[in-house]
Amino acid sequence: MNQYKNFIMQFEDIVGNNNVLIDEPMKKHTSFKVGGPADLLITPTTLEQVKDSIILCRNNSIPYYIIGNGSNLLVRDGGIRGVVIKFLKLGDIKVEGDRVIAQSGAPLTNICNEALKSNLGGLEFACGIPGSVGGAVTMNAGAYNGEISQVIESAKVIDKDGNVFLLNKEQLDLGYRMSAIQKYHYIVLEVTFKLHNSEYDTIKNRIMDLNRRRTEKQPLEYPSAGSTFKRPEGHFAAKLIEDTGLKGESIGGAQVSEKHSGFIINKGGATAGDILNLIEFVQNKVMEKFEVDLHTEVRIIGEENN
């Protein structure tokens, strides 16, 4: 039974009637296309609504989870007890000189395109990363020798008590797939990037080259959450998996991609359970062969199916 239905009217007062969904299947909101229902899913349209929603959750001991476009997220088949706050409608982007300021829900691709229009370079590496900027900053996303830490200036965040404040680059403490945001459970509201002036064609050609390489090497035609595992120190996850003989290995509808072993894909009809079982199988086999512990890069939330 959905124990949070009593709060529907209060959330509707904050975000509007059309922005509250009940027992919403999370497979509609993740790039893996799997996941059970969330008790409530709300989509705020202003940063003030985010703050008010978090305070309502805190004051009533309601668990809440923040998502962007769900591109680095695996929701278990039992779904989510509590409230999912989706930043889909918080995607404003503005350019001020050599700075690009974006709300947390803005897709990285949109930010890159705005930078391109203003002849600002530095974000080319991020143009093919499918996530939104809030998640990208939280995990210090990166690709092709670039990462968020190289271009970020500051981030406006909110804590669990509803306090809003600004963190500079040093305070964000960005490392490999980690940040102070993760450590202290902050939520990113807005991000400022400091870029550099460049030629339009130079930026455009770099973006096109990286996207071509992605298309050639990554299984973009299947649902996935991007790279499934973090890079272990001194190794590459994909090479360890391939050298263990697991390329193409499958459980149910989940498969280790034959195109890129670092990706676990939904080949068709997968459940979250299939994907989780395959992740565990890969981890165990790599540990047996190489004594290397693979840690997931994908964020895993939700309840097991009863």
Swiss-Prot record:
It is an enzyme of class 1 (oxidoreductase). Its cofactor is FAD. Gene3D superfamilies: 3.30.465.10, UDP-N-acetylenolpyruvoylglucosamine reductase, C-terminal domain, Uridine Diphospho-n-acetylenolpyruvylglucosamine Reductase, domain 2. The active site is at R177, S227, E297. Pathway: Cell wall biogenesis; peptidoglycan biosynthesis. It comes from the Bacteria. Residues 34-198 form the FAD-binding PCMH-type domain. It is found in: Cytoplasm. It holds the Pfam family FAD_binding_4. Its main location: cytoplasm. One of its GO terms (cellular component) is cytosol. Keywords: Cell cycle, Cell division, Cell shape, Cell wall biogenesis/degradation, Cytoplasm, FAD, Flavoprotein, NADP, Oxidoreductase, Peptidoglycan synthesis. Its EC number is 1.3.1.98. GO terms for molecular function: FAD binding; flavin adenine dinucleotide binding; UDP-N-acetylmuramate dehydrogenase activity. PROSITE patterns: FAD_PCMH. One of its GO terms (biological process) is cell division. It catalyses: UDP-N-acetyl-alpha-D-muramate + NADP(+) = UDP-N-acetyl-3-O-(1-carboxyvinyl)-alpha-D-glucosamine + NADPH + H(+). The keyword Zinc does not apply. Cell wall formation. Belongs to the MurB family. NCBIfam families: murB (TIGR00179), PRK13905.1 (NF010480). This is UDP-N-acetylenolpyruvoylglucosamine reductase. It comes from Clostridium botulinum (strain Hall / ATCC 3502 / NCTC 13319 / Type A). The gene is murB.
